[in-house]
Swiss-Prot record:
Cysteine disulfide links: none
Superkingdom, natural source: Bacteria
Gene: atpA
HAMAP family listed in its UniProt record: ATP_synth_alpha_bact
Residues the UniProt record annotates as site (Required for activity): S370
The species this protein was found in: Brucella abortus (strain 2308)
Ranges annotated as spanning the membrane: none
Listed GO CC annotations: plasma membrane; proton-transporting ATP synthase complex
PROSITE patterns membership: ATPASE_ALPHA_BETA (PS00152)
Protein name: ATP synthase subunit alpha
Length: 509
């Protein structure tokens, strides 16, 4: 066999040229113990708090407890495949998620991985899940309405863009329905409104049944609202760290729109379950428990999340992120630990009551206990003009109704007040999936406060409202358009609206 020197030297030169001398350095540790979704790891001396670490098999975790001799890591996934002695690698990255318009129309988990079977998400940007909220200087006070499409809320407890409005109530009182209707109400603006008014929606489901989340997504899809929505799901079967992380992940996705001069709305459904997941993690990490066994920083958990909802000023793009956190109470007890915490953080609350729900008053909003601390600055002028008196009348009605149970002979004025109150309460009822545009709400409430319903039987109010809206949509489009464009009831518009309602009231039998 011939040995060709030239050939050998050519091969050697090629090998030397392609020789890579870069050594891959990664800091690794060892699992000391694992169980209940928590791993104690030895050797990750330089790991950062909140850093993502990787276990064998691609399972991720997050370093939360940095102690002198070990690190407490919460595991995002099943801990069955992790055993003592396994090697744990640092990734060098704080937990982040993909953000951007590519996520619209998708259902993702708390780490931003798609779970809807529609293929990978090609997001161009990633953001940390836990960032500092905007300071005082970049903010502006809330002044634009965030229309929910529900008369009881838009008239009495208005929500503005950049506000945090808590939805609180027992189970099965229609809390999720309020968020769903608010999402559906954005459809007309997305279809033919200007870009600057569009509101992108993020729904975070924490600790709910998968079937419930699937139902929510199905309704959004059927009604064409999924195209401007993102759903982040950490269901009841997901590990506690995922349930803890989901609201932060959803918030980061909403902040992308806020920081790019657009508007976003995020519903956290619900934060009670996030607090329970956080309590579970904290106790397993051996952090000292406080009231109701929650850790001492559970207030900070919710405050740092909700403070990220803000209205930014014009120099910072004038974007906004509105938050609708949900809290589930037990037996209408709003003085428990988590409800009082979140009430004190938010700018108002919508209080839903089981009794009202079973009486058929839906949405079951208790108008007396619900408040919006932003108030009428989050309403258009037309709504302020008509809804100003309805609040007072309903408050008087509630007071009188309590007395009227005892006395049978009531004077005419009291009787009139009770009649009006019963009809206004009926007027504020609304079936699910039928949000109304603001101008339609203004017209209906105008009819209510100006005595058009007083002579009707209570059970005719709903029919009158339907007929009036149908008549306005077909024969008096100019009135509705006028209210939409002017955003106020001018004398001319008021006269036209009055004439339209008069004409309909005459024909209504």
């Amino acid at each position: 066999m011939d040995i060709r020197a030239a050939e050998i030297s050519a091969i050697l030169k090629e090998q030397i040229k392609n020789f890579g001398k870069e050594a891959e350095v990664s800091e690794v540790g060892q699992v000391l113990s694992v169980g209940d979704g928590i791993a104690r790891v030895y050797g990750l001396d330089n790991v950062q708090a909140g850093e993502m670490v990787e276990f064998p098999g691609g399972i991720r975790g997050m370093a939360l407890n940095l102690e002198s001799d070990n690190v407490g890591v919460v595991i995002f996934g099943a801990d069955r495949d992790i055993k003592e002695g396994d090697v744990v690698k640092r990734t060098g990255a704080i937990v982040d998620v993909p953000v951007g318009p590519e996520l619209l129309g998708r259902v993702v988990d708390a780490l931003g991985n798609p779970i809807d079977g529609k293929g990978p998400i090609k997001a161009k940007e990633r953001r940390r899940v836990d960032v500092k909220a905007p300071g005082i200087i970049p903010r502006k006070s809330v002044h634009e309405p965030m229309s929910t499409g529900l008369k009881a809320i838009d008239a009495l407890i208005p929500v503005g863009r950049g506000q945090r409005e808590l939805v609180i109530g027992d189970r099965q009182t229609g809390k999720t329905a309020i968020i769903l209707d608010t999402f559906l109400n954005q459809k007309p603006i997305h279809d033919n409104g200007p870009d600057k008014d569009k509101l992108y929606c993020v729904y975070v489901a924490v600790g709910q049944k998968r079937s419930t989340v699937a139902q929510f997504v199905k309704v959004l899809e059927e009604r064409g609202a999924l195209e401007y929505s993102i759903v982040v799901a950490a269901t009841a079967s997901d590990p506690a760290p995922m349930q803890y992380l989901a609201p932060f992940a959803g918030c980061a996705m909403g902040e992308y729109f806020r920081d790019n001069g657009q508007h976003a709305l995020i519903g956290y459904d619900d934060l009670s379950k996030q607090a329970v997941a956080y309590r579970q993690m904290s106790l397993l990490l051996r952090r000292p428990p406080g009231r109701e066994a929650y850790p001492g920083d559970v207030f900070y958990l919710h405050s740092r999340l909700l403070e990220r909802a803000a209205k930014l000023n014009d120099e910072n793009g004038a974007g906004s992120l509105t938050a609708l956190p949900v809290i589930e109470t037990q037996g209408n007890d709003v003085s428990a630990f988590i409800p009082t915490n979140v009430i004190s953080i938010t700018d108002g609350q919508i209080f839903l009551e089981t009794n009202l729900f079973y009486q058929g008053i839906r949405p079951a909003v208790n108008v007396g206990l619900s408040v919006s601390r932003v108030g009428s600055s989050a309403q258009i002028k037309a709504m302020k003009q008509v809804a100003g008196s309805i609040k007072g009348e309903l408050a008087q009605y509630r007071e009188m109704a309590a007395f009227a149970q005892f006395g049978s002979d009531l004077d005419a004025a009291t009787q009139r007040l009770l009649n009006r109150g019963a009809r206004l309460t009926e007027l504020l009822k609304q079936p699910q999936f039928s949000p109304l545009k603001t101008e339609e709400q203004v017209a209906v409430i105008y009819a209510g406060v100006n005595g058009y319903l007083d002579k009707l039987a209570v059970n005719q109010v709903g029919k009158f409202e339907e007929g009036l809206l149908a008549s306005l949509r077909t024969e008096h489009k100019d009135v509705l358009e006028g209210i939409r464009n002017e955003k106020a009831l001018t004398d001319d518009l008021k006269a036209k609206l009055k004439a339209a309602i008069d004409a309909f009231a005459k024909s209504f039998v």
